[in-house]
């Protein structure tokens, strides 16, 4: 079996359907004895240029190991699903399991926020000290 990196973008109004789509696509891969090495839901992000007068889309990244027939089925499913704006399937030489640069950047932002949620750790401590 070969390794593939798959990215697809979903219409922002259909974001609530993304978990079901992910489950359907990963199910097709695992049924064909494939493996999911990495699955990242990047959420809604700004597009570099408008697609169908849209400025945002919901991004999903998958790194999989699957037979070519299964990948062809996925590409056909992407093509006939109106909610999928764009998709890209690339064959890779090895399985990629480490976090993508997008996921790493998100983790860094989350760790910098500290335990207070949206406020920075210093702001939360300054308020506690002032009281």
Swiss-Prot record:
Residues 96-131 are annotated as: Disordered. It holds the Pfam family Ribosomal_S6. GO terms for molecular function: small ribosomal subunit rRNA binding; structural constituent of ribosome. Residues 104-122 have a biased composition (Basic and acidic residues). InterPro entries: Ribosomal_bS6, Ribosomal_bS6_sf, Ribosomal_S6_plastid/chlpt, Transl_elong_EF1B/ribsomal_bS6. Gene3D superfamilies: 3.30.70.60. The keyword Glycoprotein does not apply. Keywords: Ribonucleoprotein, Ribosomal protein, RNA-binding, rRNA-binding. One of its GO terms (cellular component) is cytosolic small ribosomal subunit. Coiled coil: none annotated. SUPFAM superfamilies: Ribosomal protein S6. One of its GO terms (biological process) is translation. Belongs to the bacterial ribosomal protein bS6 family. Binds together with bS18 to 16S ribosomal RNA. HAMAP family: Ribosomal_bS6. This is Small ribosomal subunit protein bS6. It comes from Shewanella sp. (strain ANA-3). The lineage of its organism: Bacteria, Pseudomonadati, Pseudomonadota, Gammaproteobacteria, Alteromonadales.
